[in-house]
Amino acid sequence: MDVDTRLLRYFAAVAEEGSLTGAARRLFVSQPALTKQIRRLEDDLGVPLFARSRSGMALTEAGRELAVRVPALLDVWDEAVRATARAARVLRLGFLDAGAVGVVHEVIAEFRQAQPEWRVELRQFDWSDPSAGLAGGEVDAAVVRLPFPGQEALEVRELFVEERGVLLSARHPLANSKTVEFRELWDEPFVAAGAETGAWRDYWLATEEREGHPLRVGAVTNRPDEWLGAVAAGCVALAPASTARFYSHPDVVFRSVRGVSPSRVGLARPRGRKREAALDELLEAIARRLSRS
């Protein structure tokens, strides 16, 4: 029998969290999607793994047996993937948006000249995974925007901060302002990331800076092109200043905002993992360049 390792990761998260809500938040997936995947694993194995009730998810006897073995299985698989990448001399670097990556392409080009035996793969993830692939073990390190759920389990090095401003439709009454007070936006419909992104979503909605004022969500998306389209159609969105340089739309303008904290950009990698000298060299070069940018 072949079982998708992603299903095992989902199972392990629900078993450890004791609820779909906590596991969905940790995995950056929606609760309905997680429920569907757990059902799929149960169908594949032919046994119920959880007893479901209003108070949460309790492991069945079969589920407890699997829960004991899954962490070791996943550890072995993850190490096999890493060993394969090392043997192939591949470094995988995740990112979310071009603005955060900035001059990384130049650093990678220089690294390839200095270390021609290594290949660097840049992998872009959408906003449904603010860890940029680290949560699922899909990358070796990532350029990330802080804060995001699960970052306390990672080794994170903050590199720089940049202004958070607002994206507005060019037809918006505030579009001609050089600077906007955040309170002027409180009643506007905001573009939000999916609820599964937790603290990431809250940060980009500036929920802590609304002084209790209720939030209006006008659109939900995890993709930059849909995000810009929603703004052009009349929603508003907080965004880092670099967005104006790397993403554009003829009907969208970027304006400075007073009353919100800046965006922080960092490098993240798993804790406690065997260090690869080539990866250390690459990340140090990226850190130096981004810190100066």
For each feature predicted by the language model, list its residue ranges:
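Hydrophobic hinge/microswitch elements
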Residues: 126-131, 135-139, 145, 194-255
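A late-sequence structural motif
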Residues: 103, 245, 253-293
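Central regulatory/effector-binding core of bacterial HTH transcription factors
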Residues: 88-149, 221
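Secondary-structure junction motif
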Residues: 145, 178-182, 188-211, 275-283
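Short helix-boundary/capping micro-motifs
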Residues: 12-30, 46
